Regions:
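His/Asp/Glu-rich mid-to-C-terminal helical/loop segments that flank catalytic regions of hydrolases
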Residues: 158, 224-241, 271-273, 318-325, ...
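Acidic, glycine-rich active-site loops and adjacent beta-strand->loop/helix elements
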Residues: 77-79, 140-148, 170-173, 212, ...
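Active-site metal-coordination/substrate-binding segment of hydrolases
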Residues: 65-163, 203, 314-318, 328, ...
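A short beta-alpha structural unit
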Residues: 17-21, 263-265, 299-311, 349, ...
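Active-site-adjacent substrate-binding region
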Residues: 219, 226-228, 232-249, 394, ...
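Midchain, well-structured core segments that form catalytic/ion-binding scaffolds
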Residues: 103-106, 146-147, 152-366
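Acidic/His- and Gly-rich active-site-bordering loop/insert found
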Residues: 3-104
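Zn-dependent metallopeptidase/amidohydrolase metal-coordination segment
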Residues: 8-12, 336, 343-357, 364, ...
């Protein structure tokens, strides 16, 4: 056994140690499913496994708590598998090698899997600890959270009976989450033809770079500049007075990232060349002043190029540039339920020429309110459809609308105050969690999310703060005792 099994509370660390010895990559959860089923059988726990591989175990109430509502303890069983390049490790076969490093537990050159292994461990500990006082308990372990929320999407509708759900997949002790955003991606496809470039044109390449970028959920309220929108503004300006002809546009990559870089290749008539360059300098100066406080490293450059052979047909150019300028981007609405939380947003993620006849524009919408998510999706579709694009959407995933009046939240906050003499931070996140999908199948659920402190998740620097695990455990037990 590892040295971590001597840490307190030992019953939690012993379960975590056992979990680290079972390979559990996303989409390869067969062995951890077998581990969980064996655990249930060994401890005479009722259990059920659905078609996708999710496992739920049930423990009866302790004497005197039989009339309490059932509480679901939820965690995901898969882990992100990353290692340093100089480490020999097979995530399909090898156990995680844990070590204590000061006040932290980490792995030897790999991800630790405390996301969400420590949540699993706490749930298993509750199931076998006879000293814990609680009403009926269901422990739900989902598959493939990390790469597609597959377990939550495919959760059997007869798996759960509980009224309250405690998600154990949070990474900051002292915080209680009560909401998350749902999301949907939109892809607009412009069909185009290339035409022979006109004679007597001077061609340029404009580059926007060194923007901060960031996560399109967590960072969308920070005023980060979108590189695709910025390049489109220059093109729009040039089309008004200088007969600008577009040849190429490329910007952004990931659907869930605010784009940091973009460039375009275009031409203007030689007779307008000097005037256009002067206009560009004024335009660039205006942008630098506009972005000075929120994008201090913003860079825009214009370089003349050799003659280009082909340019975009005029109709597609008009539709593309005008829609990129006009499509909404950034924060659409703030939450009235949780002060400071973004409720609804959209991110113009990428613009790509694909093959010989398509331009593909990807936009990502988020909202903690399902109807608002649909509305912002409709806004985006309307702009691109009016511009002549074919528009399609992903299946999307639902949000978890914050309920500050939730009885479970009130009991969890009170429990935290009693235990630690301080107020927890009650928050919601403008990104996706499994909780929104649970609500879709079980709309009467009340939910909260909390956990110990993790840092460096999804990387070989992942580590779990030892001192926060007892606080996490104590809070969980107090919630179970008082709901």
């Amino acid at each position: 056994m590892s040295a971590i099994t001597n840490l307190e509370p030992r019953i939690v660390w012993e379960q975590f140690d056992a979990i680290t010895r079972v390979p559990r990559p996303s989409k390869k959860e067969g062995r951890i499913i077998e581990f969980l089923v064996d655990f249930a059988r060994k401890h005479n726990l009722e259990y059920k496994k659905d078609a996708i591989g999710n496992v739920v175990m049930r423990k009866p109430a302790t004497p005197g708590f039989e009339n309490r509502p059932t509480v679901i303890l939820q965690s995901h069983m898969d882990m992100v598998c990353e290692k340093n390049s100089d480490v020999e490790f097979d995530f399909d076969r090898d156990p995680i090698r844990t070590r204590i490093d000061g006040g932290w537990v980490r792995a030897e050159g790999t991800t630790l899997g405390a996301d969400c292994g420590i949540g699993m461990a706490a749930a298993l500990a509750v199931l076998i600890d006879p000293s814990v006082e609680h009403g009926p308990v269901e422990a739900l372990f989902t598959v493939d959270e990390e790469t597609g929320l597959t377990g939550a999407f495919e959760l059997g509708e007869d798996m759960l009976t509980g009224k309250y759900l405690v998600n154990l997949d949070l990474e900051d002790e002292g915080e209680i989450f009560i909401g998350c955003a749902g999301g949907i991606d939109t892809v607009a496809t412009f069909r185009y033809t290339m035409e022979e470039a006109p004679k007597n044109y001077a061609f340029f390449r404009v580059d926007v770079s060194d923007l901060q970028g960031g996560h399109s959920g967590d960072d969308i309220d920070k005023g980060r500049v979108n590189s695709n929108k910025t390049v489109a503004r220059l093109l729009w300006d040039g089309m008004q007075s200088y007969e600008l002809k577009l040849s190429w546009f490329d910007g952004g990559n990931l659907r869930n990232a605010i784009p940091r870089e973009a460039y375009a290749i275009f031409g203007v008539p030689v007779r307008f060349k000097d005037e256009f360059i002067k206009r560009y300098k004024l335009f660039a100066a205006d942008l630098e002043a506009e972005f000075r406080l929120r994008e201090p490293n913003f860079k825009i450059t214009l370089n003349e190029m050799p003659q280009v052979d082909r340019v975009l047909d005029a109709r597609t150019q008009f539709g593309l540039v005008y829609s990129l300028v006009g499509v909404p981007n950034g924060v659409i609405a703030m939450s009235f339920a949780v002060p400071g939380l973004v409720e609804t947003s959209t991110n113009l993620a990428s613009v790509k020429f694909v093959g010989d006849d398509r331009i593909v524009v990807t936009s990502s919408q988020r909202s903690s309110v399902e109807s608002a998510k649909t509305y912002v999706m409709q806004m985006v579709e309307s702009v691109f459809a009016l511009a002549g694009a074919d528009v399609a959407h992903s299946d999307g995933y639902p949000g978890w609308t914050p309920d500050p009046q939730s009885a479970l939240l009130a009991k969890t906050v009170d429990a935290y105050k009693r235990l630690f003499g301080a107020d927890p931070k009650v928050r919601a996140i403008h990104a996706g969690l499994e909780c929104g999908l649970f609500l879709e199948k079980y709309p009467e659920l009340e939910m909260v999310s909390f956990g110990p402190t993790l840092r460096g998740v999804h990387s070989p620097d992942e580590r779990l703060e030892i001192a926060t695990v007892p606080k996490f455990w104590d809070l969980l037990l107090e919630v179970l005792k008082t709901v």
